[in-house]
């Protein structure tokens, strides 16, 4: 890992020193260069990165790199400290005709299978172990749509994945959680 250089400044307490140190290490991860962006990919990427973008809606066929590009741009924006966290929201709709039934465990355990696309993309874009580190530090959050009500996403890049599986009421609930200095990217097939 490389150490991020910062300007020297006076620190008034041990707490402030600890917070400053943790902040500098929080964004210290490497992002690999993308393998190929065609013109449509580049247009989507540029839209996410543009400072005036507050909300973007993207639809495209399965496998067209929508989630990959959104996560890639999101990690870059976090590394540049434009946002403090990346929030991944997804419906818990299963794609099979038959349900697996209730899963055992806590909410994180139950939702973790639905967060696999986020985990895979972060692992592919960065080095191994980055997803776990970012999740533990609260920089990356995966939230089921069922738990969005009452939250406000400040200083966050919010990726709403598989939006075609959301009801109008669920989408409205998600989009009304918009907070200060946030950006929404809604992806669907």
Report the location of each language-model feature.
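Conserved RecA-like ASCE ATPase "motif II neighborhood" in helicase/translocase motors
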Residues: 136-173
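Conserved adenine-nucleotide phosphate-binding loops and their immediately adjacent elements
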Residues: 22-33
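Conserved P-loop
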Residues: 56-137
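Structural recognition of the conserved hydrophobic beta-strand(s) that form the central parallel beta-sheet
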Residues: 159-161, 183-189
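N-terminal pre-P-loop "Q-motif" helix
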Residues: 33-52
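Conserved catalytic/switch belt of AAA+ P-loop NTPases
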Residues: 119-127, 172-185
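Interdomain "pre-motor" coupling segment immediately N-terminal to P-loop NTPase/helicase cores
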Residues: 1-23
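Pre-Walker A (Motif I) flank of P-loop NTPase domains
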Residues: 51-56, 155
């Amino acid at each position: 890992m490389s150490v991020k250089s910062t300007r020297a400044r006076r620190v008034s307490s041990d707490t402030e020193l600890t917070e400053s140190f943790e902040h500098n290490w929080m964004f210290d991860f490497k992002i690999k260069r993308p393998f190929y962006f065609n013109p449509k990919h580049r247009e989507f990427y540029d839209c996410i990165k543009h400072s005036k973008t507050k909300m973007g809606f993207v639809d495209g066929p399965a496998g067209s790199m929508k989630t990959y590009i959104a996560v890639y741009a999101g990690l870059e924006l976090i590394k540049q400290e434009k946002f403090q966290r990346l929030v991944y929201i997804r419906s818990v709709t299963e794609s099979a005709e038959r349900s697996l039934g209730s899963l055992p465990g806590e909410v994180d355990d139950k939702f973790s299978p639905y967060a696999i696309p986020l985990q895979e993309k972060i692992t592919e874009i960065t080095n191994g172990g980055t997803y776990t580190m970012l999740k533990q530090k609260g920089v990356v959050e995966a939230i089921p749509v069922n738990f969005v009500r009452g939250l406000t996403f400040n200083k966050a890049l919010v990726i709403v994945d598989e939006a075609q599986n959301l009801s109008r009421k669920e989408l409205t609930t998600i989009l009304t959680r918009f907070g200060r200095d946030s950006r929404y990217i809604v992806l669907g097939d």
